[in-house]
Every structure is written in C-alpha cells, then in structure tokens.
Amino acid sequence: MSEKSKYSFKCLENKCDTKACHIRPRVGVTISDLARWMNQGYIMNILPGITIHMPETEKDDFYFETARKPLESDSESTACVFYNEQANACEIRYSRPISCQTFPLEFNGEKYVLSSKDCPGVGHGDVSKEALQDARKLAEQEYKERIETTAALPAVYSVMMSQMIRQSAEAMQNLSEEDRKKMDEIITKSRGEPASEESSSNDQSG
C-alpha cells in the first residue's frame, strides 16, 4: 500500500448535508462505551438516551443502541437522540460511542467495509499509512466490543431480571395481609378477571 491510502475520509461535521451518521438505522453502543462514560462522569447525562433491543425471535440478538427521535424537517424519518438538528451536530461528539468514532469504516470479522455509502466525507482529505492503521485498529476494537456486548447482554439481562423478581417477591412478603389482598384485587381488575369470592363477600358485608 502506498503512503496515501486508497481509503480517505474527513468528517465534514456540521457542514455535512446527508446526516448519514445521525440517521443510520442503528447507532450501536457497547458495554465498554458505558464503562467509559461512567469513568468520565457522563453516564447519568447519556444513559437516558440509551435503549436495549429485546430479541423478537430466537435469531435476534440483544444489543444496546441510542434512542431515536423524529426529525423536525421530516417527521417520517428518525435520527439518533443525540443529534442536534438546529446545529447539525452531535451533542456528545467528543465522547461519542465507538461505533460513531469508526464510522463509516467497519470491520466485519474478515475485512474492512464501508457501513454507509451516503457519507459525503468518504473520499475527502488524505489519510496517511499510519492514520489508516489507526483507523483499522479502532474498527477492529469496535468489532471486538460489539461481539463481546452481544455475547454478554443475555446473561446481564437475566441477572437483572432475576434480581428484580427477587426484590418484588420480598416486597410482597413484607406486605400486610390487608395490603396483599388489595394488591391481588388490583391485579385481578387489571386482568379483567372476576373478583374472588372472599373479596366479593367482604365488599357486600361492608
């Protein structure tokens, strides 16, 4: 490879007219992203904008991604929740997810590919051999973090759900008999089921 790589890229930042990185279908987030934001002290500001995708079929994966919001200029289209449409810029640019740092270069485990052909920054600027190596290393790191997150999330989710179930069960056990009956009645009504005979007789006697 020559000193000047075939791959060249320069982010146009707020001069970009396609918003390709902001409107792409998914802006992935890794567990390492969360750890980095925690260490930087940004986690509480960023966390409200992060969602977890729940698998709809056995073939689907768990994954973290940024939340979406409709574009003011096109209500039928959505963008990353951290996209500031007025400024045409990312609100967390200097601490953005690793998937944004590598965009549009991506590593799929075998080769490097362009994740978007709509990004106008591709073909702009000159990328030295050293800069290309750094970009590829970062793309490989993003791939590694993405795979590790996909592998770990089912277990993390299961642990969290188990903890919530245990806490709910303990809270129910600590309820008084009267409060427990009231809770049962609320659950029964929410399901549209007829009240129990005991509850009905109590209501009639009252």
Predicted regions and their residues:
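Short loop/turn segments that flank or connect secondary-structure elements
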Residues: 1-206
